Each structure stands twice: as C-alpha cells, then as structure tokens.
A protein has these predicted regions:
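Membrane-embedded alpha-helical segments and the immediately adjacent membrane-proximal loops
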Residues: 1-362
Length: 362
C-alpha cells in the first residue's frame, strides 16, 4: 500500500521507505517471538546451566561477573523500550502541534490539506477524518498501533542482545576458569595455594583432579559452541534482513533530516527515529564483536593454565582444545558476513552513499 501511494513521487517514496522496511523486518521478528519460543527457552537454559557454576578464585568472581551482565542486559532492554516508545510519542506530539498551529477551525474546508498531510507517517485511516477532532483521533489510532508494534520489535531486540551478552559473559568466565585450573584443582583437594610439584604424575590425586577439571571445562565449552549454533540458526536470517534494510533506512532517515528545518519538532522526530535504528543494529554488532574477542582470549587462557608439570593426557587434551579455538567463535549475518563492528561501519558507509544518491535526484 505504501509503495502504491508513494512511488509516484520520489521524494515521498524516499521519505517513507525507512518506515516500510522497519515494519517489514518487524514482522519477521514477531514471527521469531511467536514460533521460536521453545528454541529460545532452550538456548536460555544452556546459557544458565547450574552444572557450570564456578566459585570465585583470587580476584575474579564468576557469579558477580554474570550478574553485571544481567544488569547490563536489563538496562539495554529498558533503553530499547523507552527509545522505541518515545519515537511514537514524539511524532504524535509533533503532529498535534502542527495541526493546531495551521488549522484554526474545526475542519479542513478552508484549506487545501487533508488529515493525511499531517500524519507523521503514511497511514491508511480506516474512518472519516473531515473534522479536526477526527484527525486527532486518527493520530491516537496510529500511535497505539505503532506503539504495540514497536514494543514487539523491542522485545525481539532486547532478547537477542541479552542472549549475546550472556554468551559473551560465559566465554569470558570460561577463559578465566581455564587460566586458574591448577588453583581450582588445589582448592578442590584442600591443598594450600603455594603447593607445587615437579611432575603431576608423582601425585595421582592432583593429576586426576586436573584432568577432571579440564574435561568439565571442555564440556562447558562444547555447550557454549552449541548455544552459539542455535543462536545463529534462530537469528541469522532476520539479522541479514535487518542489515540490508538498514542500508536504506539510514539513508532514508538522513534524507528526511536533511529536508527538515533544524530545530523544528519534525527535525527531532526524525533524529530520534534515526538514533533508534542506529542503536538497534549497533547493539547486536557490538556484542557480536565482543563474543569473537572473548573466544579468541580462551586460547591464550589455555596457554597460561600452568600446564608445564601436567601429565601427557592432560597436555594432549589441552592441545586439542587449543586447536579448536584457533578458529574463533563468531555469529554471522545470513552466513555472508561476521557480526562485528566492521560490518556496522560498512553498513553506515553504504547508507551514506545511498543518501548522496537520494540528494542528487531530489
């Protein structure tokens, strides 16, 4: 419907293409929330499995680190809800201010405008809007509909970011646990911190505990790798659609901002919408990048795990794990590109090119 009504005028089309793509991707996100609930719950259970709870050693407390990750995900989720909601509130307020300024009477008879001219976004009004109060009612009708849809999108984005944060936290925790494996083994055997041996094989209890701990940590790593695969399967396609859409959404938003007088209410409406869309992709790219960094540090943690005096079987198992971690963990955008900050920069650069194109044909 938007295409049929706006494609006749290139300026109008460019101005509305961002909203069109936003809601198209939003439908895919709604589909994931509705039909992927069991898979999402399975991923959450894998990332918070109590079997892989670790005690604090030295200056690192895994439980506190994980709680900090929970607090961060909560703050980001609340921020997304507030930003997405405020976009509709600000556009509603702007429309009311404009219509009350330009329309002094109770209807549009003495003007050459209709209610559609004052709508912040293209919207098919399902009832008569000849009167001013009817147009204001249409504002409420549109904003409530957009608000509900914005909350659904915020639910998806908040959930996705939370899963990325938890995966990153677990990888960081696992890296610290690998590094302190000897210290944890000594604690498990109630041995003093400064207890040392030349060869672990001379102390079978230490050798057995070290190998037991390494096997347990490696099993945790396998669980995280499986969780990564499930997250990839669940969100990879919608992330691809989101990334491709952002190429045009960013350029459309920048075009709208450039066409609006600076300081006007409409200017701040478009600016807030642009910030929302930028935050949406930036969050997942940022934590996708953090996951890759955390996984790369695991290999270094394995090397720093005080393995010189360990047994042959311990060293072989350690080498196998290090070999696996030579290939870092990363999420992809539809299997085409890694979910990193470099991708975000590439998308923004591409959108600037489209923005320049839109400017040249206005």
């Amino acid at each position: 419907m938007i295409l049929n009504e706006t494609v006749k005028n290139i300026n109008t089309f460019v101005g509305h293409i961002g909203m069109l793509l936003t809601h198209t991707v939003g439908i895919l996100k709604f589909y994931i929330l509705v039909f992927g609930r069991k898979k999402i719950q399975n991923i959450m259970d894998m990332l918070k499995d109590d079997e892989y709870y670790y005690d604090a050693v030295d200056n690192f407390c895994p439980a506190q680190f994980l709680n900090n990750g929970k607090k961060l995900s909560t703050k980001l989720s609340v921020l997304l809800f507030m930003m997405y909601s405020f976009s509709g509130i600000l556009s509603h307020t702007s429309s009311l201010m404009v219509i009350n300024t330009e329309i002094k009477g109770d209807n549009f008879l003495e003007t050459n405008k209709t209610c559609q001219d004052f709508m912040p976004f293209f919207f098919k009004i399902p009832f008569n809007t000849d009167e001013k109060w009817e147009c204001e009612l249409a504002f409420w009708f549109m904003d409530i509909s957009f608000g509900i849809f914005a909350w659904l999108i915020a639910c998806h984005d908040g959930l996705y970011v939370t899963l990325l944060i938890f995966l990153r936290c677990q990888l960081v925790i696992l890296g610290q646990v690998f590094r302190s494996i000897r210290r944890r083994s000594l604690l498990a055997l109630n041995l003093p911190k400064n207890f040392s041996v030349i060869y672990d094989r001379d102390h079978p209890e230490i050798e057995a505990e070290m190998y037991k701990q390494l096997t347990h940590y490696t099993a945790h790593l396998k669980v995280l790798l499986k969780a990564r695969d499930k997250i990839e399967d669940m969100f990879s396609f919608v992330t691809l659609c989101q990334t491709l859409a952002c190429l045009f959404i960013y350029s459309s938003a920048l075009y709208n901002i450039s066409m609006t007088p600076i300081g006007s209410t409409e200017f701040f409406v478009q600016l807030e919408y642009f910030i929302c869309i930028l935050l949406e992709l930036s969050a997942i790219c940022w934590f996708g990048n953090e996951i890759t960094i955390a996984s790369e540090l695991i290999r270094l943690s394995l090397y720093e795990s005080d393995w010189l005096s360990t047994s042959t079987r311990f060293k072989k198992s350690l080498i196998l794990t290090m070999t696996r971690m030579q290939r870092p963990i990363y999420l992809t955008i539809g299997k085409f590109s890694r979910l990193t900050l470099a991708t975000l920069v590439a998308v923004f650069r591409g959108s600037l090119s489209y923005f320049a194109l839109f400017q040249s044909i206005q």
